[in-house]
């Protein structure tokens, strides 16, 4: 409904990312952390470490020139993701690639639930916690990026191979948007969960 949509807009306003079109980003993720594995915060040079709970979409077929109405046929399943972000690195380089692609900056799990378990797009409660404190709380179909649009847009002229993982935006409540900002520190534990899929918890080292 309206409240959830406003929450998403608030998040983007909080981090001052104005845009006329959706920004699409490719990240260099060599491997995803699983539940319980430690996130290396790279705190020797990262001072603004943040979390983002997101719905992960896993493609089951190569996708090229896919129409929005056909996207559901290309989705293998869904999982829970934490798109870890170094905000100071993002702004230092005036782009998102490096600040979201450092080693261990992507966690996913605990399972991939097959797409036939949900409608497309799924409407599932999505939350994050830091040390047990609720930080983000929304519904997956109210995230900023529309799943059908993401897959269709990216597949125009560029093949998305089977196994590609797409993440779809994060609700309000990230550390940078708090007043004052509240970034992660060594020893913190971030928990991300989506109803119907599961939860992952990862400590910061």
Give, region by region, the residue ranges found by the protein language model.
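N-terminal low-complexity segments that are often proline-rich with Ser/Thr-Pro
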Residues: 1-29
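Structural signature of FAD isoalloxazine-binding scaffolds in flavoprotein oxidoreductases
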Residues: 25-33, 51, 185, 189-195
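Catalytic-pocket segment enriched in acidic/His residues
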Residues: 87-205
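Short, structured patches in soluble enzyme cores that scaffold and shape functional sites
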Residues: 43, 51-55, 59-61, 79-84, ...
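A generic local secondary-structure boundary/capping motif
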Residues: 40-49, 54, 63-70, 96-100, ...
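Short helix/loop capping segments that flank catalytic or ligand/cofactor-binding pockets
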Residues: 35, 66-68, 88-90
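Generic beta-strand structural signal
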Residues: 28, 35-37, 47-55, 76-77
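RNA pseudouridine synthases
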Residues: 66-81
